[in-house]
A protein has these predicted regions:
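Short, contiguous alpha-helical
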Residues: 6-21, 25-72, 112-172
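A mid-sequence interfacial segment
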Residues: 91-126
Length: 172
């Protein structure tokens, strides 16, 4: 068996779902919790993880996961009940990112605020993983800063994912 980025992407997808499940157990006001910047509150961060993954998926594959380029982003998270929709959207975009691990590692022509750039597909896929990890940590910090039960990051580590995938017959 070869070591692949697909397993890291599967971990990312699982950890995203576990984070959303945890948020669904918290009171409504937890969605407005923030660590240091009130513009980056829990609901905004969770939305940002999935919305960014939607954009990464399109950039990597050229296929639309949820939103067309130029269309409005996915809907904001206003209440705990909106997290069920976010979980479905995360499942869609994360599945597309996992599938992209089988594509050739080619240079992609992309645009950002600074203009046109080129990045290897593997770089964008790796950044998608890093981005989600970084912001799940941000969510945990925001919850803890405002006195809500944070997700215990060790519970969504690769160590715990390996236990989960082994118990569920998901190993390659």
């Amino acid at each position: 068996m070869s070591i692949t980025v697909a397993r890291l992407l599967r971990h990312m997808a699982w950890a995203n779902q576990e984070t959303i499940k945890h948020l669904q157990t918290l009171p409504e006001e937890s969605l407005k919790a923030y660590a240091t910047n009130p513009e980056w509150f829990v609901a905004e961060i969770a939305h940002h993880i999935v919305d960014s993954a939607d954009h990464y998926a399109y950039e990597i594959t050229g296929n639309v996961a949820i939103t067309q380029p130029g269309d409005p982003c996915i809907a904001d998270i206003e209440s705990i009940s909106d997290l069920a929709r976010l979980a479905k959207q995360a499942g869609i975009v994360d599945a597309q990112l996992i599938g992209a691990a089988d594509l050739d590692d080619v240079w992609l022509d992309l645009k950002n605020d600074g203009g046109k750039i080129q990045r290897l597909r593997s770089t964008v896929l790796s950044q998608a993983i890093h981005h989600a990890t970084e912001h799940r940590t941000h969510i945990a910090s925001a919850l803890e800063a405002k006195g809500f039960e944070p997700i215990f990051l060790d519970d969504i580590s690769l160590w715990d994912y390996e236990i989960y995938e082994t118990a569920n017959g998901l190993r390659d």
